[in-house]
């Protein structure tokens, strides 16, 4: 019984934050940016670091440098970048919640591309309409230790 409990606890560690990934395609922002044959409406699961934020009249646009995702769907910020994308969210979005430098994971659908610039370099941004977004707490990447420990302790009051 004890072994079943321990295995259950270990298996629960690092659970994905976005559970509905049934229709997610294995496509990277670079694949879309480079003109691959990927249809609008394709569902993706991407994550990365916020580098720019813009509230427009009826939606917000968040520029994200993409990174591969860990098992818990957190962006692996120490890995090489997989390109950039623009996350589009409806209505007004609080800029403090999506501050530059924070990391996020999004499940969304591709909605075409937009030509823009990264500094002086022309760049084609994949547009993603967000369906489910998780913003990671500051410093999440430094807290990757196991959440289960075994030990004996004594509490004294």
Predicted regions and their residues:
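Sec-dependent bacterial lipoprotein signal peptides
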Residues: 1-13
């Amino acid at each position: 019984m004890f072994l079943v409990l321990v295995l259950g606890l270990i298996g629960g560690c690092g659970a994905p934050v976005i559970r509905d990934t049934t229709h997610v395609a294995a496509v990277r922002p670079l694949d879309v940016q480079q003109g691959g044959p990927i249809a609008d409406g394709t569902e993706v699961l991407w994550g990365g670091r916020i580098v720019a934020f813009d509230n427009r009249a009826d939606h917000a646009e968040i520029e994200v440098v993409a990174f591969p995702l860990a098992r818990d769907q957190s962006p692996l910020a120490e890995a090489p970048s997989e390109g950039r994308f623009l996350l589009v969210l409806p209505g007004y979005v609080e800029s403090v919640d999506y501050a530059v430098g924070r990391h996020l994971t999004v499940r969304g659908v591709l909605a075409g591309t937009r030509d823009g610039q990264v500094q002086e370099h022309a760049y084609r941004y994949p547009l993603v309409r967000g369906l489910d977004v998780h913003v990671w707490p500051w410093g999440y990447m430094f807290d990757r230790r196991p959440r289960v420990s075994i030990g004996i302790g004594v509490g004294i009051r």
